[in-house]
Amino acid sequence: MKIILTADVTGLGESGDIVEVKDGYARNLLLPRGLAIVATKGAQKQVETIRRTQEAKRVRNLEHAQELKQQLQGLGAVTLTAKVSKQGKLFGSITAADIVSAVRKAGGPNLDKRSVDTRGHIKSLGKHAVDVRLHPDVKASVSVQISAAS
């Protein structure tokens, strides 16, 4: 029986693939669990339409991520001020939310704090490199300058 997978099935294929399986496997496992639909001409056309829209969306997301990367590279170093002790140690640490806020104030794009990777906690003054995951294929690096608040 020819079926169209609606979800990724280990050992069989990915969502949208048209595969040939035994009738019992399709009727007793794949179809009742919603992992596949019977391959008809209408369903195949619908799958092709969905694939085209997903591909177009993937390309748009990649282009948008490239634009964000260009904006971040044009920013240069982003400056943050924080309270420090007499020994020069920060009270607390600089978080991803602090970095996102500083990037926005510096005229950069609005980022998601979950996309910022600080490589651990930033607890010292000076210049730090921070990675930003904009897309699975696009990463940018932002330079963050931490200075003492007066």
Swiss-Prot record:
InterPro entries: Ribosomal_bL9, Ribosomal_bL9/RNase_H1_N, Ribosomal_bL9_bac/chp, Ribosomal_bL9_C, Ribosomal_bL9_C_sf, Ribosomal_bL9_N, Ribosomal_bL9_N_sf. Pfam families: Ribosomal_L9_C, Ribosomal_L9_N. GO terms for molecular function: rRNA binding; structural constituent of ribosome. Keywords: Ribonucleoprotein, Ribosomal protein, RNA-binding, rRNA-binding. This is Large ribosomal subunit protein bL9. GO terms for cellular component: ribonucleoprotein complex; ribosome. PANTHER family: 50S RIBOSOMAL PROTEIN L9. Belongs to the bacterial ribosomal protein bL9 family. It comes from Saccharopolyspora erythraea (strain ATCC 11635 / DSM 40517 / JCM 4748 / NBRC 13426 / NCIMB 8594 / NRRL 2338). GO terms for biological process: translation. SUPFAM superfamilies: L9 N-domain-like (SSF55658), Ribosomal protein L9 C-domain (SSF55653). Binds to the 23S rRNA. It comes from the Bacteria.
